[in-house]
């Protein structure tokens, strides 16, 4: 989600709200708050998509089989390869294709991705409330 008026941040947590991003295998640096700061040139939807990608990456390391997210767009459309190419930039399209492939593999191995309301999502940054 968006964070503290400084741009987009990504947060991935366990059910208790503890950040899991230290386990990301991409070397993305985690800030003091346990989030990855993307700056102001990425959209919130891009951040949500990257969050799902990172969550699947972390789940593959930990053996977790359930991932929850609060973005309808990412969970029900983009991560299934459903998007309008003409309305998105190349970075977002590239990430959509990676997430779609990763989701297929995650689900083939018994993984599930489910929607949860932002009101009860422990990873929700809460700045939109």
Predicted regions and their residues:
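C-terminal functional segments of enzyme domains
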Residues: 3-5, 10, 24, 65-68, ...
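Residue-level detector of functional hotspots within protein domains
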Residues: 35, 51-53, 97-99
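RNase H-like nuclease fold core
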Residues: 1-46, 58
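Metal-dependent nuclease catalytic cores in nucleic-acid-processing enzymes
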Residues: 46-63
